[in-house]
Amino acid sequence: MNLAKYIDHTALKPETTKAQIAQLAQEAREYEFMSVCVNPAHVKYAKSLLEGTDVLVCTVIGFPLGANTPAVKAFETKDAIADGAGEVDMVINIGALKDKNYDLVAEDIKAVVDAAGDVTTKVIIETALLTDEEKVKACEIAQAQGADFVKTSTGFSTGGATKEDVALMRKTVGPDMGVKASGGVRSYEDVMTMIEAGATRIGASAGVQILKGEEAKGDY
């Protein structure tokens, strides 16, 4: 099991500097993580640092609130891909889900999936804000719109990934769709717990410490 290939090595805080992106990319090269996950403004720079490697640049769309319109999310997706993004993690319209406006939730996801084309799309449902019924519905809609993954959390809300949520998401989408656990995954033990629950990708800012088997003290 190549644990590094499960990990999106992440730096999404608003105060992230160019130097921190350079460090993130260097660590990703050294440890051969699946991707670095950075905000859209950092995609082009991260891509330039990872030329000639297998490490993808992942970015986030409508992040962290998910409250942009479908058209804005689609534009953001296309712009990020033009800059070199190889994967996109979008946040759903959480309020629309709460309102049971499932057509809008679906339209929003489809806008990004269509804009992304062959680029992997992950759909962040922000589990901490949802009931179990809403989590299931969000996963069903994401799957129906052709997304590649469902993802637990932004890491910027009231809670992160739990093994219970990952297991529920896996049960909902079946064996073939990706499930990404993110938010509060800080140790080797955390990662293994999430993988055992059904996760096929991990979002973490503590990727190096995880691989070293260390408990990290980061925020997300």
From Swiss-Prot:
Localisation per UniProt entry: Cytoplasm
Main location (coarse class): cytoplasm
Cellular component terms (Gene Ontology): cytoplasm
SUPFAM superfamilies named among the record's database cross-references: Aldolase
Keywords recorded for this protein, A-Z: Cytoplasm, Lyase, Schiff base
Class of this enzyme: lyase
GO biological process assignments: 2-deoxyribose 1-phosphate catabolic process; carbohydrate catabolic process; deoxyribonucleotide catabolic process
Family annotation (CDD domains): DeoC
Pathway: Carbohydrate degradation; 2-deoxy-D-ribose 1-phosphate degradation; D-glyceraldehyde 3-phosphate and acetaldehyde from 2-deoxy-alpha-D-ribose 1-phosphate: step 2/2
Catalysed transformations (reactions): 2-deoxy-D-ribose 5-phosphate = D-glyceraldehyde 3-phosphate + acetaldehyde
E.C. number(s) listed in UniProt: 4.1.2.4
Active-site residue numbers: 89, 151, 180
A single GO molecular function term of this UniProt record: deoxyribose-phosphate aldolase activity
Function: Catalyzes a reversible aldol reaction between acetaldehyde and D-glyceraldehyde 3-phosphate to generate 2-deoxy-D-ribose 5-phosphate.
Protein name: Deoxyribose-phosphate aldolase
Organism name: Macrococcus caseolyticus (strain JCSC5402) (Macrococcoides caseolyticum)
Gene this protein is translated from: deoC
